[in-house]
């Protein structure tokens, strides 16, 4: 059985803060996000390198991020990584709200030594993940690199975004992964920025997203 609960927030009106809890037979997760934060993070997924990547989202996206997860790591990391992506996506969707005044689109290129990645995001309301990454190793620390796709798929499906991720160069898997998450964070930061010239306006000619 799966349950996701929106935890009541004490934030004042206008704050882009949300907290979501997700409990299943495989994981117990609580996520809290502040989209207008300073990059503070408290992370506990049980997978060290995954926490390191989540920290990149907070630091480079200037998003305050609090994630607690107890997962069935005695099996493997799949449920933990995927379900954190799902819950984080739900929290983002709630925190973003009606999307009035946001820039909607964001992109970033991020290098790390020989590695270079590009991420483009659209808060379109239409979930879609388009990811072209060929990791040069099957695992980084305790993180199975196949699960990076599962994390982003979970996020995309529940945040309602279109996301393009391309690793353009790189032969060190750690560097590949880190550039992906840093570029993702900076693309989010750009897309979620408020444009004072379109305050109160939904960024679509349809009038809704």
Curated annotation (Swiss-Prot):
Pathway participation: Amino-acid biosynthesis; L-histidine biosynthesis; L-histidine from 5-phospho-alpha-D-ribose 1-diphosphate: step 6/9
Matches recorded under PROSITE patterns: IGP_DEHYDRATASE_1 (PS00954), IGP_DEHYDRATASE_2 (PS00955)
EC number: 4.2.1.19
GO molecular function, one term: imidazoleglycerol-phosphate dehydratase activity
Keyword Hydrolase: no
Cleavable signal peptide: none
Reaction catalysis annotation: D-erythro-1-(imidazol-4-yl)glycerol 3-phosphate = 3-(imidazol-4-yl)-2-oxopropyl phosphate + H2O
Main enzyme class: lyase
InterPro entries linked: IGPD_sf, ImidazoleglycerolP_deHydtase, ImidazoleglycerP_deHydtase_CS, Ribosomal_Su5_D2-typ_SF
Keywords attached to this entry: Amino-acid biosynthesis, Cytoplasm, Histidine biosynthesis, Lyase
GO CC term, one of those recorded: cytoplasm
Location within or outside the cell: Cytoplasm
Coiled-coil ranges from the UniProt annotation: none
GO biological process, one term: L-histidine biosynthetic process
HAMAP family associated with the record: HisB (MF_00076)
Record family assignment: Belongs to the imidazoleglycerol-phosphate dehydratase family.
Record's protein name: Imidazoleglycerol-phosphate dehydratase
Organism name: Paracidovorax citrulli (strain AAC00-1) (Acidovorax citrulli)
Lineage: Bacteria, Pseudomonadati, Pseudomonadota, Betaproteobacteria, Burkholderiales
Gene: hisB
């Amino acid at each position: 059985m799966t349950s996701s609960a929106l935890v009541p927030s004490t934030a004042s009106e206008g704050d882009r803060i949300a907290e979501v809890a997700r409990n299943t037979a495989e994981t117990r997760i609580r996520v809290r996000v502040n989209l207008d934060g300073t990059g503070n993070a408290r992370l506990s997924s049980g997978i060290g390198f995954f926490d390191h990547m989540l920290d990149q989202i907070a630091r480079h996206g200037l998003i305050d991020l609090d994630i607690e997860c107890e997962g069935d790591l005695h099996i493997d990391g799949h449920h933990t990584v995927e379900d954190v992506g799902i819950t984080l996506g739900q929290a983002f969707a709630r925190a973003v709200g009606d999307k009035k005044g946001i820039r909607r689109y964001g992109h970033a290129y991020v290098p790390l030594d020989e590695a270079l990645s590009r991420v483009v995001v659209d808060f379109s309301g239409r979930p879609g993940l388009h990811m072209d990454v060929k990791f040069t190793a099957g695992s980084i620390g305790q993180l199975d690199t196949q699960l990076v796709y599962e994390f982003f798929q979970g996020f995309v499906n529940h945040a309602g975004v279109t996301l393009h991720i391309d690793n353009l160069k790189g032969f060190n898997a750690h560097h590949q992964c880190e550039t992906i998450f840093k570029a993702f964070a900076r693309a989010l930061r750009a897309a979620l920025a408020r444009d004072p010239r379109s305050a109160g306006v939904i960024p679509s000619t349809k009038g809704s997203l």
